[in-house]
Amino acid sequence: MRERSRRRLLLIAASAGILAALAPGSRSIAASKASPPVDAARRLADAVVSSPELTSDTLYLCDRIGGRLTGSPACRLAVSWTRSRFEEAGLEGVRLEPFTLPRAWLPGEGEARLLAPVAMDLEIATVPYSPDTGSVLEARVFDAATGSPADIARQGKSARGAIGLVRTAEMRSLVDLFTEYMRDREMLRAAQEAGVAGLLLMSTRPRGLLYRHPIRTDGTLTPVPVALVRREHAQRIGRLLDSGDEVRVRLAIEGTAGGPIESHNVIADIPGRERPGEIVLFGAHLDSWDLGTGAEDNAVNCAAVIAVARAMKQLGLSARRTIRFALFTGEEQGLWGSLDYVRRHAAELDNHVAVVIMDIGSGRVTGYYLNGREELRGPVVRALEPVGRFGPFEHPIEAVDGTDNFDFLLSGVPNLIAAQDMTNYLPDYHAASDVFETVNGEQAAKNTAITAALLWHLAEARERPAPRQTRQEVEELIRRTGLEPQMKAFGQWDAWVSGRRGIFN
């Protein structure tokens, strides 16, 4: 990975000190124009940080609804429930916007057993968008090392009809996580070309922790069956291979992929008092993977979106511009909900002044990713002055792929992502351990207050924070920030080049 990409990824995890509390405000605002903008931002932050509903909403999403895989009954329930929460808060124009996920995927049964040279049941998790094995697959295991094309090609004809064991380093940083993501596309291509019967991926997490990563985000199935294996079990297989023994495994993955399926984004507005046609959007993804309950990723930040909307209505606040609240689904499978939003609202993108996304759990907000737009730095710095007690803040210039800002970025809309301390986020990312207990409720309230102040400034300022970019300017941003390798790894590059992603009127 190039040094620029490494620096960008490491900066995501950089943390800054945040002070312990905000004093809750005691006086409401009858109308936003009755108070100076800075005062309104402080009162909004006070209201958010002192509200118990941020925690109770997070708890409901985790415990009453659970993992919210797009297309599942739980995700449909989450859509309905969050819609009702916006309506109860008194927001206008609360609506569901449907879109089609090109291929449904729901978890099915998966079993694996080591047959030789010793017998042992293997703990596995089915990998999203893996095809089934048809019938029970019994095959010899070969050492695929890191899963690189060279590692697989090194096996020659002996890889045909065999199952490859892909070894991994233990994940300790965001760089390690992205190494895992960046590996998959070329690994699958090489496995298909070699005639490999299947792949067993060693979990990067110790102590039996399993997780789900989508290794295909373009709506297609992987070319060979793939399963994630408990790290300790995969390490045992590796040692047996190292000893020279012939290792055989039985693998069965039940078909779980279907055809296109409808899902929904949840949208609500607080209309602007002077420029209602101009929009500042605050979003988070509502869907999650299913092994855990999607607490850090991303129930806590869905609750933050609702909390800001509720506080604004309780205080009677209406900014100069409309603030739109969006809970997207289909994010985990490839950003499908936010992609549909950009396409659906293509004629309005010129009037989208800014987009702010939260998607990194409840770790401390240390600033906001500028996503390659240096001109956003000044407006963001000014916006956070009312909550400077929570600083200092740093705003990385790096551009980020992999969350719901991205199709706005590709369409030239100014976009920001909350940069957060990932120390307690990474170990549970997409894992069975991502449950309510992982959430830092006190810090989540502060994070929401910080973002509320940012939103208020962006919606209240007389001037836009930055212009919308042209396609040529976005092309230059992609080149300058080194996004191309990530876009290729996530299966987005061809769609961008062909014009299927990136909306320009």
Question: Residue spans of the language-model regions?
Answer:
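His/Asp/Glu-rich mid-to-C-terminal helical/loop segments that flank catalytic regions of hydrolases
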Residues: 226-229, 310, 426-491, 503-505
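N-terminal hydrophobic or amphipathic helices/low-complexity stretches enriched
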Residues: 29-77, 84, 88-89, 154, ...
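N-terminal secretory signal peptides and thylakoid transit peptides that target proteins
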Residues: 2-16
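Short helix-loop-beta-strand segments that form the rim/entrance of peptidase-like active sites
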Residues: 56, 221, 311-336
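Soluble metallo-hydrolase cores and metallopeptidase-like ectodomains found primarily
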Residues: 38-40, 120-156, 216-295, 307-310, ...
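Noncatalytic luminal/extracellular "stalk/propeptide" segments of secretory-pathway proteins
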Residues: 37, 59, 63-163, 169-172
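Extracellular/luminal Protease-associated
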Residues: 72, 123-225, 293, 391-394
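Metal-dependent peptidase/peptidase-like ectodomains
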Residues: 117-121, 234, 275, 290, ...
